[in-house]
Amino acid sequence: MLLHGNAVVGQSGGPTAAINATLSGVIKGALEAKEEGIIGTLYGMRNGIEGFLKENLIDLFDVFENAHDLSTLEATPAAALGSCRRKLKSHEEDAETYAKILEILKKYDIRYFFYIGGNDSMDTVLKLSRYAASHDYELRVVGVPKTIDNDLMATDHTPGFGSAAKFVATTVKEIIRDINVYTMDAVTIVEIMGRDAGWLTASSALASLNGAGPDLVYLPERVFDTDTFVSDVKERLKDHPAILVAVSEGIRFADGEYVGAGTQSGAVDVFGHKYLAGTGKVLESIVKNSIGCKVRSVELSLTQRCASHISSLTDINESVMVGKGAVKAATEGRTGVMMTIDRAEGDEYATTVGCADIAGIANAIKTVPAEYINEAGNGITEAGIEYLKPLIMGELELEYEMGLPKHFVI
C-alpha cells in the first residue's frame, strides 16, 4: 500500500569517505519517489537524531539543485549533514523524548525515516520502528549501513569499508617503500582502527597484491601474547632488516584487557565503548625493550575514514546503490530493516541490494572469520585476500579547484 508523506534522513556515528555517497543515493531515490507522488519533501536532520529533536531540519531538495551537486557530494568525505553519538534510551526509560519525536514526525508529516549509520545507529532504528508501531503512527524506518569497521551483521560488507581499506592498503604499501631504503634492523608498527573486529587491519594485507605487504598482522579476533609477538618479530628480522607490523587498536590479552589500556584514561563514550589509541606505542615499547632495534609506531587515526582522495569506485557506487535501495524498500512497505549488500556466488564479483530485519543486527558484531586468519594468528590467508580484493577496485574521478579536491559543504 502506498504511503504518501514527507521523508527525513540523518547521518550518525563516525564519518566515512562514502557516507555522503549513501546520502546522495537517498536523495536520488527520494527524487524519483517525488516524481511518483509518494514523497513530498526530503528533510535532512542536522547532527542526526540530536538535531531532529531540536527540529534542525533542512529541505534537501532545495539544497541540491542538480546532478553535479550530487556528484560532488559523493566525492566529499565526512558527514555533510553532521553527525552525533546520541544513544536513545528505551521508551520506558525516556517516554518524553519519544513523545517529542512523534510530535515532530506529525508536525512535518514525516512518514519515511532513513538513518545512515553503524552498529549503534541501528539500535536507534530498532527503537524508533518499534515505538512508531506501538503508537499507531504509520512510519517506515530504514537503517542504511555505513562503517569503516565492516562489522555489521547480515551484509556481505558495509559502505565506507572499501574506501578505508583501499587507503590502508595504499598507505601500508607506501610506508613499506619508505622503510626499505635503509639496511639497519628496524620495526615499524602501524596502528589501524578496529575495536572488536579486525577487518580494516586485515585489509593492510592487500598491499601484497602488487608488491610487499605487512610482515605481521594482528587482529582482535586472536588473543595477543607478548612473548609470541617478540618471537614473531625476531624471526621476521632474520629474513630482512626492515619489517612492518599492522595491528588493530583493539587487540587484547588473554584476560580480555586491551593491549593499549595502560595508555588510556578509562573514559567511555555514550554507548559504553572505551576510547582506544596507544596500542602501537605499547608494542613499540615492547620491541624497544625486548629487541633493542630501531622502532617507531604510526597511528593512521582519522585519515582512515576521511581519505576521499583515494576512494574505491566500487565502494562509492555501492553506497549510492544502497541509499537508493533504502528509499525503494521503504516506499514498497518495508520498515524496521537495514539495507544489505549481497554478493553473488561465482568468480565474477557482482552485488545486489537487499534488506534484513534490524532486530538481528542492532548491537551485534560481525568479526573476521577464522578461515581468513592464518594458523599462527599473525597474517591473512588467501581466502581473506580474495574476499577483500574486489572491494577496493576502481578509482573515483575527482573534480579539483585551486589544485585541491572540491567538496560539497551544506
Short names for language-model regions:
Residues 1, 55-111, 120, 159-161, ...:
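Glycine-rich oxoanion-binding loops at beta->alpha junctions
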Residues 1-58:
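N-terminal phosphate-binding or glycine-rich loops at protein starts, especially the Walker A/P-loop
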Residues 12-14, 45-50, 85-86, 118-119, ...:
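Short, ordered loop/turn segments at secondary-structure junctions
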Residues 16-26, 52-53, 89, 96-99, ...:
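Short glycine/serine/threonine-rich phosphate/pyrophosphate-binding segments
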Residues 36-45, 178-186, 243-245, 292-300, ...:
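Flexible, glycine/charged-enriched surface loops at secondary-structure junctions
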Residues 104, 112-117, 123-138, 142, ...:
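Accessory alpha-helical/coil subdomains and C-terminal extensions
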Residues 261-410:
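C-terminal non-catalytic interaction/assembly regions of soluble proteins
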